[in-house]
């Protein structure tokens, strides 16, 4: 994006900038109200629902139009405009440790909701317990061999035992 998107807020209500999602690499066009006193704003990606932070820098003294060409939108965020990392007031006085990305705990908490976990089937419960039993009797057996034996034991199991309680393993 060129200086056409960076404009002074006098007379305008918002500033525009680009943020690249760190989860799915989608480039997002962000408008920040000029009245915002926050240095960092939260942005939610419409593609993956990931939440990232955009550094809200003070308005540049350049006054220009807000029109963006398609090439400017595809160019990605310019240096110093918006970033998905936390940053201080100026880039020159930063230490190397400040360049570290945001904590990984925030990335884990912002994942889109996954599918609901289903109750394991009777077969899965039986095989899981049977593998534990077989490995306790023969600790040197490979998992593949234990699984094969457990599957054979399931095949020879009377059907009455298979239909017992539907509680999870």
Swiss-Prot record:
InterPro entries: HMG_box_dom_sf, YABBY, YABBY_C, YABBY_N. CDD domains: HMG-box_SF (cd00084). One of its GO terms (biological process) is cell fate commitment. Keywords: Metal-binding, Nucleus, Zinc, Zinc-finger. One of its GO terms (cellular component) is nucleus. Residues 63-122 are annotated as: Disordered. The keyword Nucleus applies. The keyword Nucleus applies. A zinc finger (C4-type) spans 21-48. Belongs to the YABBY family. PANTHER family: AXIAL REGULATOR YABBY 4, PROTEIN YABBY 6-RELATED. This is Protein YABBY 7. It comes from Oryza sativa subsp. japonica (Rice).
